[in-house]
Amino acid sequence: MNQQTDKAILVVSFGTSYEASRKATIEKIEQDIRNAFQDHRIYRAWTSKFIISILKKRDNYTVPTVKEALEQMITDGIREVVVQPTHILDGIENNIMKEEVLSYKESFDKIAFGTPLLADSKDESQAINAVTTEFSDLKETEALVFMGHGTTHQVNTVYAGLDQKFKESAHANVFIGTVEVDPAIHDLVKEVTSFQPSKIYVTPFMIVAGNHAHNDMAGDSPDSWVCQFENAGFEVCPIIKGLGEYPGIRRMYVEHAQKAIDSMK
């Protein structure tokens, strides 16, 4: 990293209280970006003040907020900022973050935003290829079910669109739903049941494998996705692996950051 440069990339994540997943996902994305852009200084910020507070109290581990990271950049003499979120969609969390960053626009010469993971149909196709590559040994008789987070923002329609795209790209045994909104688990159980798989793999469609993955997806509660599929009569295997562990997904964030840098020229 060039300590003398006045150019920086701020990698913004929601955050996670799960150390192992943080190291395997968020930190891997940050490292890939650091390796790709050695003429930029790399900064980190998380948007979840709740998780930041937990880590500070529990582990004495400090993560800056977006505001704190921007203030540090000003102190360090940064003039050009690329903000690369590790969010999946350009939804509520991402929009709040962008507003916060833009409140500092007078403090920098240039600010550009990289897009979240899924910004257009090309991203969707690339993401599908990245995740299906990781499950290339999935048998035709088996089903792969992704748990997305979901949002009340209108971009939530991306999940239903992704599910359809999986089917259109010769992956009829791949399904995706969300934990917060539609497509919901009860709809997924019906859809997967009609497929009659010999085995179901359930894994998060989230950057980190955190609380949702460990509890809502793979927990012992009757409401967990694993339990609901088991109650429907299926053999279920949870895979606690965040999207940030997939090289193809991390590569997409690097590409999005590059596009943002190019837009500043």
Predicted segments, located by residue:
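Active-site-proximal alpha-helix that buttresses catalytic centers in soluble enzyme cores
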Residues: 1-265
